[in-house]
C-alpha cells in the first residue's frame, strides 16, 4: 500500500522541504508535519550557530529513528563569516563530533575580509567533514557579487553538495532576490544544488519552487505549524 506523502503537489511534483529549527523543541512537530530534512541550529536570532553537543546527540538519535536526515550548523558565533585560527579549530572539533554521532550533513562557510572564500579555512573544514554532506550556508550571500561565479566553481571542485542562498541581503524580501537565485541556478547548471532560503514559507514555497524550477527549498516557516 502506498504511503501518503504530503509533499506531493498537483501534477505529482515533490517539494523537498528542509526546516531550520532552533534546538530540539520543534523537531517532533516538524517531522510529524512532513519535514524532509532538518537543519539544526542554536540561536536562530543571529542566523543560527552550532548547537550544543547534548542537543545534537539527542536530535540526531531521534531523527535517525524517524529516518529524517539532519544537517548541523557549524558556526561558532553570530556576526560575519571571517574566522580566526582558533575559531576554525573550534569548527573542526565540532565537525569531528558530528562525524562520531552519525550526522548526515554539516553547514558552514568561511570568508576572507575582502569578500571571497577563505580557501585555506574551507579546505581544513571540508577535510574534517569526511562522510557527511557539505552545505555552504548563507555566507554565500556575503561574498562580493563579482566573486560568486568563481565561488560556485570552487565549491563544485571541492565536492560541496549544496549552497544555501537568499540571493541577496536577508533584509531584502525573497521576491526581490529570485532573479539573482535563478542566475546562480543557471550558472551552477546541475553541478551543485542551489538551495533557496530566507523568507521561504508555507504560503510562498510552491510559487518560488515553480518560478525557480527547483524541488528543494529551505526555511524556518516552510511548513505550516512549525515555527509560526
State each model region's role.
Residues 14-36, 43-50:
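N-terminal pre-domain/capping segments
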Amino acid at each position: 500500500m502506498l504511503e501518503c506523502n504530503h509533499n506531493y503537489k498537483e501534477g505529482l511534483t515533490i517539494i523537498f522541504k528542509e526546516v531550520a529549527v532552533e534546538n530540539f523543541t520543534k523537531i517532533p512537530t516538524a517531522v510529524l508535519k512532513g519535514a524532509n530534512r532538518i537543519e539544526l541550529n542554536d540561536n536562530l536570532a543571529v542566523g543560527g550557530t552550532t548547537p550544543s553537543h547534548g542537543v545534537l546527540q539527542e536530535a540526531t538519535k531521534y531523527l535517525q529513528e524517524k529516518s529524517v536526515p539532519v544537517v548541523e550548523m557549524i558556526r561558532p558565533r553570530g556576526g560575519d563569516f571571517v574566522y580566526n585560527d582558533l575559531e576554525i579549530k573550534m569548527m573542526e572539533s565540532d565537525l569531528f563530533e558530528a562525524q562520531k554521532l552519525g550526522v548526515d550533513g554539516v553547514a558552514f562557510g568561511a570568508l576572507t575580509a575582502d569578500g571571497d572564500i577563505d580557501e585555506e579555512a574551507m579546505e581544513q573544514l571540508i577535510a574534517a567533514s569526511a562522510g557527511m554532506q557539505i552545505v555552504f550556508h548563507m555566507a554565500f550571500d556575503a561574498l562580493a557579487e563579482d566573486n560568486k561565479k568563481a565561488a560556485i566553481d570552487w565549491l563544485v571542485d571541492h565536492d560541496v553538495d549544496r549552497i544555501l542562498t537568499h540571493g541577496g541581503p536577508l533584509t531584502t524580501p525573497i521576491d526581490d532576490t529570485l532573479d539573482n537565485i535563478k542566475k546562480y541556478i543557471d550558472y551552477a547548471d546541475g553541478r551543485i544544488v542551489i538551495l533557496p532560503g530566507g523568507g521561504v514559507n508555507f504560503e510562498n514555497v510552491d510559487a518560488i519552487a515553480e518560478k525557480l524550477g527547483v524541488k528543494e527549498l529551505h526555511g524556518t516557516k516552510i511548513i505550516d505549524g512549525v515555527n509560526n
